[in-house]
């Protein structure tokens, strides 16, 4: 296992460049993926719903901030919030969402935020962040002293997760675009489960981890994980 000092030296990371043929289909693929269009994406969304439900179990009456809210597909799971704000720079992802009317403020970066939040959410976003230590530091600034950070991440870097996308999404991607899905994964998922967890344990006093029970809730046998930090 890596230690914190080894991991922190890797940041900021540089995302691998995509060849032009991948760039041409990238936005289309991202929207299809986020909207769970197609059998493989639908199956992934069903498995991912476990994390949405786990995050929503933490009920309270207060203000929520979601980082990387995408298509706003988590909003329907939260029932008791006063206001729901988001950080999402990709406007195409949410502009046609039926949950848009439930959103109070839409931010593109942390500098626009003046509030503190009791509950901050980030779902399948931390694996994409090229400067994750900076992101975590900014999150701590806007997290209420009695608040908590709730994140969901894939078990990137582990056997089950890799086999999962290789035999579902990768096949569908190859069939549709005649391209190698592993190129997209290397471009998109720049952080592993292990790296994310070690960073979080350095920045927060209490870090609770719960793995998806499918296939088994242990290393190399689970696809996704829910992490609560306070």
Language model segments and positions:
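Short linear sequence elements within intrinsically disordered, low-complexity coil regions
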Residues: 4, 9, 16, 27, ...
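Conserved SAM-binding loop
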Residues: 50-161, 225-230
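S-adenosyl-L-methionine-dependent methyltransferase catalytic module, highlighting the catalytic core
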Residues: 6-21, 32-34, 38-42, 130-141, ...
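Class I SAM-dependent methyltransferase Rossmann-like catalytic core
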Residues: 23-56
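Short linear sequence motifs
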Residues: 4, 15, 19-22, 43-45, ...
